[in-house]
UniProtKB/Swiss-Prot annotation:
GO terms for biological process: tRNA N1-guanine methylation. HAMAP family: TrmD. This is tRNA (guanine-N(1)-)-methyltransferase. It catalyses: guanosine(37) in tRNA + S-adenosyl-L-methionine = N(1)-methylguanosine(37) in tRNA + S-adenosyl-L-homocysteine + H(+).
């Protein structure tokens, strides 16, 4: 999968390109991440990419011209990497608190893309004409504001890359994460058997895979009900999970 990131701080992306699972994916050429600096498309000696807003007000606004040229360069690069450069296959995404909130289901949908062109804003924002002309979607991490779009862009890429086939080593690792089936994840344990007076639940040591699966599901249900009632209300169980829920309800009555 191909990622082009448009940012005035391309150095920030060394972390995602060089470390951890995402770094390994880049090294093994499963993923390509290229950074494009809009300052490279300016014509003045100061390489300015921002100006004061029309109508007055605080702060600066990123100008449309250098960003539009950076996006066109990103589209060319994406095409050279085999991407179908259109909204359906390689969209231009603007990281913005005004966008659609990122979710696990939207991340899974994004794994079907050939690539992404991710636009990172700074200052007071970006000239609206650039957004209306070039941006296909806006994505937010939540109802809060950061100093720029670089960290959200890395979150987006990390979440998508780890869901790509053969990235995690064991694809079941991603399948068991929180939100994948609509519930929070179950608790996990490893050695030693006892820590701070607390032992590993015996069912996990039993080797009985069906009982372990049921226990993990019961823990997911308990956690989701307690911590994220909104997720629980929206949860739709599978046929097998519905049977387990009935069994849990009967056990609670006893």
């Amino acid at each position: 999968m191909y990622f082009a990131v448009i940012s005035i701080f391309p150095e920030m992306f060394a972390t995602i390109r060089e470390f951890g699972i995402t770094g390994r994916a880049v090294t093994q050429k499963q993923v390509t991440i290229e950074c494009i600096n809009p300052r490279d498309f300016t014509s003045d000696n100061y390489r300015r990419i921002d100006e004061r807003p029309y109508g007055g007000g605080p702060g600066m606004v990123m100008m449309a011209e250098p960003l539009s040229q950076a996006i066109e360069d990103a589209r060319l690069r994406a095409s050279q990497h085999g991407c179908r450069v259109d909204k359906a296959h390689c969209p231009v995404i603007y990281m913005s608190p005004q966008g659609q909130t990122l979710s696990e289901s939207s991340v899974v949908d994004m794994t079907e893309y050939d690539g992404m062109i991710i636009l990172c804003g700074r200052y007071e924002g970006i000239d609206e004409r650039l957004l209306s002309q070039y941006v296909d979607m806006e994505i937010s991490l939540g109802d809060y504001v950061l100093t720029g779009g670089e960290l959200p862009a890395m979150v987006l890429m990390d979440s998508v890359i780890r869901r790509l086939p053969d990235i995690m080593g064991d694809d079941k690792s991603a399948e068991q994460d929180s939100f994948v089936d609509g519930l929070l994840d179950c608790p996990h344990y490893t050695k030693p058997h006892e820590f701070a007076g607390m032992a590993v639940p015996e069912v996990l040591l039993s080797g009985h895979h069906a009982n372990i699966a049921k226990w993990r599901f019961s823990q997911q249900v308990e956690r989701t009900q307690a911590r994220r009632p909104d997720l629980w209300q929206a949860f739709t169980p599978t046929v097998e999970q519905a049977k387990w829920l009935k069994a849990l309800a009967k056990a609670d009555k006893k």
